[in-house]
């Protein structure tokens, strides 16, 4: 596809996230346009399509994927629908940007990894947007530069003001902690081998039955320690912080003032961020711009992604499965996942 041709995209699922992506493609990022809109709510799909020139509503998600005026697909549908929809994209040979999770369990995610590998192409990108955030990319660069020395410990905090109706304790692991799982793998370039979830005193203001906050402890292949506080009913603000402690210094992101490092003078700020869109809007924009470019240039190499792929989705699912088991038992749980080199082309 030439640079002067627009990539034609179907967006499946136009709730808060999907509608944001439609607006992002239509009004913020060049090189692509939304041609098909799909949602389980026909009224919602029609509402978004009416705001998106040149788009039309397709009622059936699989018809939307197969449509002739669709070159690539964005999935912002509920997690339980992802497996069949991603497989349909592979069958159609169409690149897909799938919001997390890739699927809702490790076995089906691994099956998708194998199905993509059998095609000999990289068609699946998973929407772990933090990898595209300026602060996270700064932190990754700092780690890789060696300025902090060998990383030893990572401290994370993930706080939300509130959660939607129906949110439960396991979803804190699968829907919230999953981001800390991915950034740990991204920053340290190694797999997580065990998880333990600690249940501190629960927030009395949280919806009944939710164990919130939770503290996760990860161990990585090389023995590094990562701890993550996840508190999703703070009632205050959206906060995501990560601190890496190395042999030669430390660095922290997420304080609304940019990266702070203890190898040089830092600063402090007192602002708060109301939600994920304000905190990670730039990351989403960068993620989509890079994905669109990768899809448009992928025919020559067979690589249609620029970011986390199917393997990363599988790894996250495997770690979260261990996390849910630990939440139930209180014990350290070893992550059950296959070695990457056991799947040719993964």
Swiss-Prot record:
Keywords: NAD, Oxidoreductase. GO terms for biological process: inositol catabolic process. InterPro entries: Gfo-Idh-MocA_inositol_DH, Gfo/Idh/MocA-like_OxRdtase_C, Gfo/Idh/MocA-like_OxRdtase_N, MI/DCI_dehydrogenase, NAD(P)-bd_dom_sf. Coiled coil: none annotated. Its EC number is 1.1.1.18. GO terms for molecular function: inositol 2-dehydrogenase (NAD+) activity; nucleotide binding. It catalyses: myo-inositol + NAD(+) = scyllo-inosose + NADH + H(+). Belongs to the Gfo/Idh/MocA family. Involved in the oxidation of myo-inositol (MI) to 2-keto-myo-inositol (2KMI or 2-inosose). Homotetramer. This is Inositol 2-dehydrogenase. The gene is iolG.
